[in-house]
Amino acid sequence: MSGNSGFVRFLYGTAPGRLLLKGILATHADRLAVAFLCSRLSRPLIGPYARRNGIQLTETQKKDFRTYRDLFLRTRTPADFDTEPSHLISPCDGWLSAYPIREDSSFAIKGSHYSLHDLLQDGDLAARYTGGDCLVLRLCPSDYHHYCYIDDGFQGENHFIPGVLHSVQPIACEKYPVFFLNRRSWTLLHTNHFGPVVQTEIGALVVGGIVNLRENQPMRRGQEKGYFELAGSTITLLFQKGCIRLKPELLTALERGEVQVRQGQWIATAPGEN
């Protein structure tokens, strides 16, 4: 869980923290937290939060933020996207990891370990991606929390899965079996260049909202797909076998750990293309 705040590590990685997390969910304190962060009472948090997380306000289109939510949903001057259609672009700012998908694969995301079946709640769909590639993009508080489409094509239905506490995946400590899977939304993207791609947005903590702007309609490369609300988040992209080749220099860098990328940056190529 490198890069997470001390409070996040406390909630996810310690027995008292996991018990506190369970209590927050049981008492609906998360709703009060959301109401506070969306109100003007949260305005004193804006300056310290921006400074602590190195948020570059010079990039934002709006300068006057009335609430913490306003700061988190800030928009910025449109980025320069890679324009070559056969180049896979990153849908967001974040820290990239890449994994081969095997039948027994599990992925560490937001303090939980997910199999593809856990992630999608659809065993038949998950099976289609065995042998393929999973890209994980972890967004930090300083990152831009809007995300875009990776290619032209057609977007299917949004499938929302509420987060739950349950006894399937341990967060850290077997002695205190408190478990958590974050709320998430997955969509099948029928892309023109990279085959059918499953994109999943995963909310953070108990206040991380996911807003997708459309479904069941054509999509355009670089067009905004949606955004996260109030807390750092993660996006995963699932590709079937042979549908992408990571850039060689990126593949080399990933051997040392996560790699920071920007929305619109070229990260992989369609097969048969240079």
Stretches with model-predicted labels:
Residues 1-274:
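Contiguous, well-folded functional domains in the mature portion of proteins
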